[in-house]
Regions:
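Catalytic cores of DNA base-excision repair glycosylases
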Residues: 37, 41-251
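Polybasic, lysine-enriched low-complexity intrinsically disordered terminal tails
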Residues: 1-43
Length: 251
């Protein structure tokens, strides 16, 4: 094997150094979370986050939950079905599903194979059918007197994680909630207001930067921005309303 010349070694080291500089990860604390910012840096980031929220709200005044529903129960089911599936596909499936099983009691009594057949096109239909039937059973039992309105209660339902619970709280009950979906995660990381890869940690990071009464609207606006402008592969910097505030404007 030939030895590298000094020049070749320097070139190689230079390339590695540049690549490391471009992809340097956020420093992590011993607990695995990004290292804490200084108080001054956190205040500055909060100001930037609030300006980003203002600009996105102006850009997407129609931002809202895209899942069709008429009740918290229907939104719960639709959100479970939306895992690893587009909202458009879910909206094609739910009209017939809710026509056949319009209430938690009806869905709890449904034949699991019939549920699977109705939701097959949303993917992972075995697990989703089990979750929505299980959640419906709980709603018709423990929560018959009233739909759960706290994140703690919602998280006890089969198939319900923080994302689903926050969707329901923010949309149906006007409870401040941050919904970390694929678009929200990508956009907040790109613009630099979230550093973690963990959805729960991203929720905490963003919540610390914005007033609670803006959480739900910001979630919708960021998701719209991710769909319409800040695409995964080719973000449209030319028409991005927050490009001047974005850490990734040169990608």
């Amino acid at each position: 094997m030939q030895r590298k010349t000094k020049t070749a070694k320097k070139r190689s080291a230079g390339k590695v150094g540049k690549a490391a500089a471009r992809k340097a990860p956020a420093r992590k604390s011993a607990a695995g979370r990004p290292a804490a910012r200084s108080a001054a840096a956190q205040r500055a980031l909060g100001q930037r986050a609030r300006e980003i929220a203002r600009l996105l709200a102006a850009e997407y005044p129609d931002a809202h939950c895209m899942l069709d529903h008429r009740s918290p129960f229907e939104l719960l089911v639709a959100t479970i079905l939306a895992a690893q599936c587009t909202d458009e596909r879910v909206n094609m499936v739910t009209p017939e599903l809710f026509h056949r099983f319009p209430t938690p009691a009806a869905m709890a009594a449904a034949d699991i194979r019939e549920l699977e057949a109705l939701i097959r096109s949303t993917g992972f239909f075995h697990n989703k059918a089990k979750s929505i039937k299980g959640a419906a059973t709980e709603l018709d039992g423990r929560f018959r007197e009233g739909f759960p309105r706290t994140i703690e209660a919602l998280l006890t339902l089969p198939g319900v994680g923080r994302k689903t619970a926050n969707v329901i709280l923010g949309v149906c009950f006007d409870t401040p909630a941050i919904v970390v979906d694929t678009h929200f995660r990508r956009v907040t990381q790109r613009i630099g207001i979230a550093r973690s890869d963990d959805p729960d940690e991203i929720e905490r990071e963003v919540a610390a930067l914005l007033p609670p009464d803006g959480w739900t609207g910001f979630s919708h606006a960021v998701t719209f921005h991710g769909r319409r402008c800040c695409a995964a592969r080719k973000p449209d910097h030319a028409r991005c309303p927050v490009a001047h505030l974005c850490d990734s404007r040169d990608i």
